[in-house]
Amino acid sequence: MAEEIPATASFTPYVHSQTLTSHNRAVSSVKFSSDGRLLASASADKTIRTYTINTINDPIAEPVQEFTGHENGISDVAFSSDARFIVSASDDKTLKLWDVETGSLIKTLIGHTNYAFCVNFNPQSNMIVSGSFDETVRIWDVTTGKCLKVLPAHSDPVTAVDFNRDGSLIVSSSYDGLCRIWDSGTGHCVKTLIDDENPPVSFVRFSPNGKFILVGTLDNTLRLWNISSAKFLKTYTGHVNAQYCISSAFSVTNGKRIVSGSEDNCVHMWELNSKKLLQKLEGHTETVMNVACHPTENLIASGSLDKTVRIWTQKKE
């Protein structure tokens, strides 16, 4: 059930639509392709799964492909912009690049000296950025699989990495309490965002317009930072995040929202501007580790320690 919070007139609550049970260990990452036609999930069971997404049909998600080859659990997965490739980050210290259609392994990117924890493509999809428990951020050439740059980014494990919308900047976060913004061409640090308290940062991502970053910290808080002023503008609370690196997302298909996983087993959704908690989506039986918002439809995917992926849709009027 989705817990109802008194609705604002314009908000239609989300409801549980489907549960995917392809994985046999915790689900660590869920991502939609940029065209919204595919969903990928990665797991501690060492596999990635893809599903076709058809919002007209029931069920919405249909399993397509299984990707196997990592020697240890997978922490993150990302699609290339054209959805031809997937990259994964694993506790086996490697990244792997996969062919989405065939499920075959294209290449293994070797260089990190500890768990590879987070990964993303740039919008042009000719570069990959990764973060690791070895405290570095690495930039890779997709075509050759070679490491282009090693950034001595942080003094603790790197928890998230993301490119902005034109690929010129990278943001990284770490348990060291810092978010850093890097020039992706030179590898130079152009800005460090520091809060007064600096709790460990569990997640970071650029806003769709690239002007803001959404930062999750292990004090049960999400903050929206303005990059140019290096000040935080808004704070979102009500969820629980004190232990895990839980992802959050921007939902832009029907008003501007912030969506996050939580250690209370719910998906939380806030109105971006008012910071009002709109809804808690109930159904998972363990921590919700990650969420993804569909690019064009009012559709959310969530992955949990309970080994399932859940699909949530807005109630039909």
UniProtKB/Swiss-Prot annotation:
Transmembrane segments: none annotated. Keywords: Methyltransferase, Nucleus, Repeat, Transferase, WD repeat. GO terms for cellular component: nucleus; Set1C/COMPASS complex. CDD domains: WD40. SMART domains: WD40. WD repeats lie at residues 22-61, 69-108, 111-152, 153-192, 196-235, 238-280, 283-317. It is found in: Nucleus. It holds the Pfam family Beta-prop_WDR5. Strongly expressed in developing embryos and endosperms. Expressed in shoot and root apical regions, and in vasculature. One of its GO terms (molecular function) is histone binding. GO terms for biological process: methylation; vegetative to reproductive phase transition of meristem. Disruption phenotype: Eearly flowering. Decreased TATA-binding protein (TBP) levels lower Ser5P Pol II levels near the transcription start sites (TSSs) of target genes and of Pol II at the genes 3'-ends thus affecting the transition from transcription initiation to transcription elongation. Significantly reduced trimethylated 'Lys-4' of histone H3 (H3K4me3) levels at the 5'-ends of WRKY70 and LTP7 genes leading to reduced transcript accumulation. Forms multiple COMPASS-like complexes involved in histone methylation by interacting with different histone H3 'Lys-4' methyltransferases such as ATX1, SDG14 or SDG16. Binds to target loci chromatin, increasing H3K4 trimethylation and causing activation of the gene. Up-regulates FLC and MAF4 expression to delay flowering. Present at the promoters and at the transcription start sites (TSS) regions of WRKY70 and LTP7; this occupancy is ATX1-dependent. Involved in the transition from transcription initiation to transcription elongation. Part of a complex composed of TRO, RBL and WDR5A. This complex is formed during both vegetative and reproductive development. Interacts with SDG14, SDG16, RBL, but not with TRO. Interacts with ATX1 and K4-methylated H3 tails. This is COMPASS-like H3K4 histone methylase component WDR5A.
